[in-house]
Amino acid sequence: MENILDFTLEELKEWLISKEEKAFRAKQVFDWIYNKLIFDFNNMKNIPYKTKNLLSDNFYVGVPKVVKKLMSQDKNTYKFLFEYKDGNIIESVVMKYKHGNSICVSTQVGCRMGCKFCASTLDGVIRNLTSGEILSQIMAAQKEIGERISNVVLMGSGEPLDNFQNVTKFLDLVTSDTTLNIGQRHITLSTCGIVPKIKELADKNYNITLAISLHSPEDLLRKEMMPIANKYSIKELMEACDYYINKTNRRITFEYALVKGKNDSIKEAKKLSTVLKGKLCHVNLIPVNEIKENSYEKSTLKNIESFGNILKENGIETTIRREMGADINAACGQLRRSYVSK
């Protein structure tokens, strides 16, 4: 059986026609799934009995089961652990803002990139998620909170560009007016910096925001923090970023997790300013998430602000990320790992 969420409307139409069914039934089915959030074919009232049976025999609506749901004390952040049909568990985070609800979705079960500050990579990657499985996190979360989600961040467990085919199909699906109709400009994809895939993504001409996990302006330190830096130098990464900017005319966000005594000095800030000066970019400074498997400590707020001021003085737009959901282990990989290791 196949997950119907992996299908575009046109693909489902073609399948129905091949079974001597009416093509317009595809739109009716999509309406039940994506607008009414009905995930059982038998509850789709305007679908004929024969067609329901045909669909039930060949497809399932692959929305994951909620195995854990946590809400922060301020009620602005929800953390979900979702279980798929094969028993694999991933996590998603919903953040409520004045401008709408945003979800951080996972693209893989685990991750193989090995970034030292990330809990989701500690056990490696188990498998890729399909386009429909990524999409289903949004649908399951919408059903749970009873509100529409309008912004998507691909920044949960997994490296999106390590699952390129499924992630790009997800982007095509989620932005379609036949499914969730989320605008491309409301989507951010975060990558540790797989250079060839950044260029390939640029060639797709999406209007999404690309976020690069940078974390150091120096190759030696970046190699220590992020194994991907052993494959691609900062020079190569910046060339790929320039290609992306020139191709899409979209501003890139550079993410920089500040670790006390590691990458938070004024010297590092000045070096980063040199690397990024003149680029169409924005820097998001992040207090690092502390995990017991490494000795990384958060930089002080004073250091973070001083670091940011250096960047601003050099004409680089900079913000400090607001911490949300710390009381519910909302940072990437933390809750899933504590759950599956029980």
Curated annotation (Swiss-Prot):
Covalent S-S links between cysteines: 104-332
The protein's Enzyme Commission number: 2.1.1.192
Keywords, alphabetical: 4Fe-4S, Cytoplasm, Disulfide bond, Iron, Iron-sulfur, Metal-binding, Methyltransferase, rRNA processing, S-adenosyl-L-methionine, Transferase, tRNA processing
Essential cofactor(s): [4Fe-4S] cluster
Cofactor: how and how many bound: Binds 1 [4Fe-4S] cluster. The cluster is coordinated with 3 cysteines and an exchangeable S-adenosyl-L-methionine.
Domain Radical SAM core: 97-327
Top-tier EC class: transferase
Alphabetical list of Gene3D superfamilies matching this protein: 1.10.150.530, Aldolase class I
Keyword Signal in annotation: no
InterPro entries, per the entry: Aldolase_TIM, Methyltransferase_A, RlmN_N, RNA_MTrfase_RlmN, rRNA_lsu_MTrfase_RlmN/Cfr, rSAM
Binding residues annotated for S-adenosyl-L-methionine, in chain numbering: 158-159, 190, 213-215, 289
PANTHER family xrefs: 23S RRNA METHYLTRANSFERASE, RADICAL SAM CORE DOMAIN-CONTAINING PROTEIN
Family per similarity comment: Belongs to the radical SAM superfamily. RlmN family.
Other remarks on this protein: Reaction proceeds by a ping-pong mechanism involving intermediate methylation of a conserved cysteine residue.
Protein name: Probable dual-specificity RNA methyltransferase RlmN
Originating species: Clostridium botulinum (strain Langeland / NCTC 10281 / Type F)
Organism lineage: Bacteria, Bacillati, Bacillota, Clostridia, Eubacteriales
